[in-house]
From Swiss-Prot:
Protein name: Peptide chain release factor 1
Keyword Acyltransferase attributed: no
Pfam families in alphabetical order: PCRF (PF03462), RF-1 (PF00472)
Single annotated GO MF: translation release factor activity, codon specific
Function recorded in the entry: Peptide chain release factor 1 directs the termination of translation in response to the peptide chain termination codons UAG and UAA.
Species: Bifidobacterium animalis subsp. lactis (strain AD011)
Keyword terms, alphabetized: Cytoplasm, Methylation, Protein biosynthesis
Length: 365
């Protein structure tokens, strides 16, 4: 039977099988860095390969059944069944072949900063921190707090954390695939604990998310001459000294002006390594934004730029309501969302993004 051959899927299968062979070689499996890179690429190809193998098996079985259909009615019946299954398998393969964000399988660095609203904004930033930590826990991800500046009332002025999956997840299961939509301004409406008149106050917190670079990521190279490194004493809430050693690190990338501070690790060496990894992650995100802009892919650029001024979500406590302003998602389970039941909200963003990618793909065909 005449059928599209999907050369892109065939190429993906060949690369996937080549990676399998490489991962069986001692010089590769004995090198954790190479194994991690190959494992991530294999996971990226896995969705396409699985869909292609399913489609290919159905098509080949259908060809064989149709050849025998004239001699055996059982084969004729089997051919009808396979023929009915082929369109769905083909559609799943076409969907798998739609270009994804190449960073979907990566882990992330997330920053939460209290906005206008004083102590109430800091308390809300703390609520967001707990929400993301609970969500990560439900997904089986690990969270590492890299730096935190808290208030005396338990709020958070700013916090930075790494959220990491276990192993090599498929792109759709990657941390970045879900949390990249969280960047922007989150607005809260509630009666502050410091409000004696019972009036509802509006305040906000900003969330910044970017994919985490690998320690040995060769996509980004940093010249040591481009770094200015300052060492200072770690501090806790209200400027209290955490220890008596100068272990905190402030790293400035001179060409871009990006500044990264790290103080939560136990030693200066560990803080320096952690700061360098965050800096590489920021530069990687900047590089991908520039590439998206040069390719004139404005939708992709808008997703990746994570505009700090964009109000993306409102959390209304009196009505127990949450609204995502990009997708018009609305639900009255704010208490559950703040306890980490965030998937339905994120799914609305993922669905909207997939619809845009599909529409863009169809326009190009």
């Amino acid at each position: 039977m005449a059928s599209e051959e999907f050369p892109a899927a065939k190429t993906a299968l060949e690369e996937y099988e080549n990676i399998e062979r490489q991962m069986g070689e001692q010089e590769v499996w004995s090198n954790p860095d190479k194994m991690r890179k190959l494992g991530r690429r294999q996971a990226q190809l896995g969705t396409i390969v699985n869909a292609y193998r399913t489609w290919l098996n159905i098509r080949n079985d259908l060809d064989a059944a149709q050849e025998m259909a004239g001699e055996d009615p059982d084969f004729a019946q089997e051919a009808k069944r396979l023929e009915s299954e082929l369109p769905e398998a083909e559609e799943k393969l076409r969907t798998a072949l739609i270009p994804r964000d190449p960073d979907d399988a990566r882990d992330v660095i997330m920053e939460i900063k209290a906005g206008a609203g004083g102590e109430e904004a800091a308390l809300f930033a703390g609520d967001l921190l707990r929400m993301y930590m609970r969500y990560a826990e439900k997904r089986g991800w690990g969270v590492t707090i890299q730096s935190e500046n808290s208030t005396e009332l338990g709020g958070v002025k700013d916090v930075q954390m790494a959220i990491r999956a276990k192993g090599n997840p498929s792109p759709e299961e990657g941390v970045w695939a879900s949390l990249k939509y969280e960047g922007g301004v989150h607005r809260v409406q509630r009666i502050p604990v410091t409000e004696s008149q019972g009036r509802i106050q509006t305040s906000a917190a900003g969330v910044i998310v970017f994919p985490e670079a690998d320690e040995d990521d060769d996509e980004i190279e940093i010249d040591p001459k481009d770094l200015k490194i300052d060492i200072f004493m770690s501090s806790g809430p209200g400027g209290q000294s955490v220890n008596t050693t100068y272990s905190a690190v402030r790293m400035t990338h001179i060409p871009t002006g990006i500044v990264v501070s790290m103080q939560d690790e136990k030693s200066q060496i560990q803080n320096r390594a952690a700061a360098l990894r965050v800096l590489k992650s920021r530069l990687l995100a900047m590089k991908h934004e520039q590439e998206a802009a040069e390719a004139a892919d404005m939708r992709h650029s808008q997703v990746r730029s994570l505009d700090r001024s964009e109000r993306i979500r409102t959390y209304n406590f009196p009505e127990n309501r949450i609204v995502d302003h990009r997708t018009n998602y609305k639900a009255y389970n704010l208490d559950a969302v703040l306890d980490g039941d965030l998937q339905a909200v994120i799914d609305s963003d993922i669905q909207a993004d997939e619809e845009q990618r599909l529409a863009s793909q169809q326009q190009q065909q």
